[in-house]
């Protein structure tokens, strides 16, 4: 995995550093950086959380990231769900995601494990880590992490208690996708008749707008073949219904045999009969997979990997 997820397009998109027993693991996508923190159990006594400071070398900015949990005793008047600096109210979790990252930016994150007491924090251990987000315009790899937080306070702050379908102009779906679905659309839409073909293997295959896009692409003359899971009622029936509604049955093969689920989620793009790129990752071709669950998509422009 290190060969794929290490250095890409001249930058580092995955990095792990350890100092004084404090380990930080960071993985960058195109619009997000994911973090995992590890501190020896013996050092966790009195731990209050983690402060995250970010230097944006691309835009020459420097600041602490914000979060929405705070210490009641030192709350300056914030209401539940409001944002505050992690300098004073550190993150109370061993994993975090910076969804304010921008494509093609170079960042230095300094993560500090804080002890002491609310209002008088004492740094216990600190790790600085350099990372670069992917740029869709260059390189052989693009990685997309959706937000996948339909039930989170961040969603409620922006859209209230409304379901994504009830938010005007699809803005809730755009926010939840964080570029993932748009990249999926582009992967399919960039095909041309007589030059490209698509080979799709799917487990959940029932997001109607995506199937509609595939039908339109097929109607343009692009060769498309699809195999999807139909071993059991779920997701088999949803898949069958969606395929019929999209008029894609002629391009599909139903996987009905086997003792295991066909948990596939990839698209191979062929150019002049040869595999040239692949869309893969953990994202099902369903509304829940694309917008609801926390998921990742990885586009690899490499003939050998695509094959």
Predicted regions: what they are:
Residues 3-136:
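Low-complexity, Ser/Thr/Pro-rich intrinsically disordered linker/stalk segments at domain junctions
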